[in-house]
């Protein structure tokens, strides 16, 4: 896919922390229950740590028990891209930032109403902007 923000690996390595680079650019996953934003309950907006695109609102964040920040929907349609992920012997749907292609996490069909979806997102993929 072509993304609005398109940088070389060298540039991403300069701009991101090693953990952010591993997750956002190499499709890594942080350990459950360790992310800085996992327990965050402040009101505000969650943006892509790589490009600053607005992705999720605290209004749709909920405690899923998964160990990662979980949301039942993005702030609006089109801010995340979905693609099939068959890694690690599993069939999942990967979530990417639609502006820079950064790996955010995965979406599952076991979330609460009104969507029934659980966007399971790595804390390192996000930055929080408090209201």
Curated annotation (Swiss-Prot):
<keyword id="KW-0560">Oxidoreductase</keyword>
<feature type="active site" description="Nucleophile">
    <location>
        <position position="120"/>
    </location>
</feature>
<keyword id="KW-0862">Zinc</keyword>
<dbReference type="GO" id="GO:0008270">
    <property type="term" value="F:zinc ion binding"/>
</dbReference>
<dbReference type="Pfam" id="PF01641">
    <property type="entry name" value="SelR"/>
</dbReference>
<dbReference type="InterPro" id="IPR002579">
    <property type="entry name" value="Met_Sox_Rdtase_MsrB_dom"/>
</dbReference>
<dbReference type="GO" id="GO:0030091">
    <property type="term" value="P:protein repair"/>
</dbReference>
<feature type="binding site">
    <location>
        <position position="100"/>
    </location>
    <ligand>
        <name>Zn(2+)</name>
    </ligand>
</feature>
<feature type="binding site">
    <location>
        <position position="48"/>
    </location>
    <ligand>
        <name>Zn(2+)</name>
    </ligand>
</feature>
<feature type="domain" description="MsrB">
    <location>
        <begin position="9"/>
        <end position="131"/>
    </location>
</feature>
<feature type="binding site">
    <location>
        <position position="97"/>
    </location>
    <ligand>
        <name>Zn(2+)</name>
    </ligand>
</feature>
<protein>
    <recommendedName>
        <fullName>Peptide methionine sulfoxide reductase MsrB</fullName>
        <ecNumber>1.8.4.12</ecNumber>
    </recommendedName>
</protein>
<feature type="binding site">
    <location>
        <position position="51"/>
    </location>
    <ligand>
        <name>Zn(2+)</name>
    </ligand>
</feature>
<keyword id="KW-0479">Metal-binding</keyword>
<dbReference type="GO" id="GO:0033743">
    <property type="term" value="F:peptide-methionine (R)-S-oxide reductase activity"/>
</dbReference>
<dbReference type="InterPro" id="IPR028427">
    <property type="entry name" value="Met_Sox_Rdtase_MsrB"/>
</dbReference>
<dbReference type="InterPro" id="IPR011057">
    <property type="entry name" value="Mss4-like_sf"/>
</dbReference>
<comment type="similarity">
    <text>Belongs to the MsrB Met sulfoxide reductase family.</text>
</comment>
<dbReference type="GO" id="GO:0005737">
    <property type="term" value="C:cytoplasm"/>
</dbReference>
<dbReference type="GO" id="GO:0006979">
    <property type="term" value="P:response to oxidative stress"/>
</dbReference>
């Amino acid at each position: 896919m072509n993304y609005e923000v398109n940088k070389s690996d060298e540039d991403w390595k300069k701009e991101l922390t090693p953990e952010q680079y591993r997750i956002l650019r190499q499709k890594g996953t942080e350990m459950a229950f360790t992310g800085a934003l996992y327990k965050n309950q402040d009101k505000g907006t969650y943006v892509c740590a790589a490009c600053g695109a607005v992705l999720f609102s605290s209004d749709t964040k909920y405690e899923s028990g998964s160990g990662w920040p979980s949301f039942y929907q993005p702030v609006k349609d089109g801010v995340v891209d979905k693609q099939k992920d068959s890694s690690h012997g599993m069939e999942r749907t990967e979530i990417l930032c639609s502006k820079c292609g950064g790996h955010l996490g995965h979406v599952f069909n076991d979330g609460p109403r009104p969507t029934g979806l659980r966007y399971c997102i790595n804390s390192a993929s996000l930055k929080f902007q408090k209201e």
